[in-house]
Amino acid sequence: MIKYQCIKNKYRIHNIIYQFSQQLKDIMGSKLTKVIVYGSYARGDYNSSSDVDVMILVKMSDNEIKKIENQVYDLAFDIEMDTGVDISPIIKNEEQYEYWLDTLPFYKNIHEEGVIVN
């Protein structure tokens, strides 16, 4: 039987991730293509010390990504300070991600186990 606290925590985390993705839209606008949760939260085998792994796919050049990445990291830090939930974001160009998807095991795992938030 699943404890109520586990269910309550799952929905709390879901809401925090959704809010994070909405704030990413504010930063990136239409250049944001996907927000994917992967790792233990996507698989459902997380524990109280797990971070939330998030792949952020964008239609931006590497230089454009460098210009906004500190904003994204600051946003993740602010969420951790407010909620105690540690979000670990990675920002990648969507075309590069798609290009390397069949070659890099890391990208394959994200594709296979990831949960698209937006």
Name each model-derived stretch.
Residues M1-K31, R43-S48, K59-N118:
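Catalytic core of pol beta-like nucleotidyltransferases
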